[in-house]
Amino acid sequence: MKIEKFEEKQLEELMLFLDENLNENYERVVFLNIRKRWPEGFLTVIDEGKIVGTCCGAILPNDKLRVLILVLQNDYQKRGIGKDLMDRMIRASEIFGVKKVTLEVRKDSDAITFYRKLGFSSVDVLPCYYQDGCDGIVMEKQL
């Protein structure tokens, strides 16, 4: 298993992976734009030649890193891979002077516990934030 920067040639495989592992639907161009703006902040987890996880983020004004996506196939969860992805993204953001990391997570997601273990706190609720009407929880971590 290896973690590497997302490459444009992986786009079709990434879209299939996300369709299978997320409830949200995104246009392909979104991921190309994310990669273009900050390639070091867009990572994939590859095992046996297949994408089994990914994360991407964006550097925002006011010294913020916003985690846009962090997802792993179920059988790769709870193995430290998500923490490794988050740590790598945060390290890559340090050259921008990032002082705060923000993200949104589904109100009904087990990932809330994961993020709390990483030092994130819930700071807001976004009613009907997700495409299926589920509320989102805004979480933040000070660096």
What are these regions (language model features)?
Residues G82, M86, D108-A111, C128-G133:
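Short glycine/proline-centered loop/turn elements that form peptide/ligand docking sites
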Residues T102-E104, R116, S121-V138:
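Conserved catalytic-core motifs of GNAT/GCN5-like acyltransferases
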Residues Q73-R79, K107-S109:
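Active-site acidic-Proline motif in GNAT/NAT acetyltransferases
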Residues K5-D75, M86-R88, A92, F96, ...:
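Acetyl-CoA-dependent GNAT
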Residues M1-I3:
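Extreme N-terminal starter segment of soluble prokaryotic enzymes
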Residues R79, F96-K99:
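Short coil/turn segments at alpha/beta junctions that flank glycine-rich nucleotide-binding fingerprints
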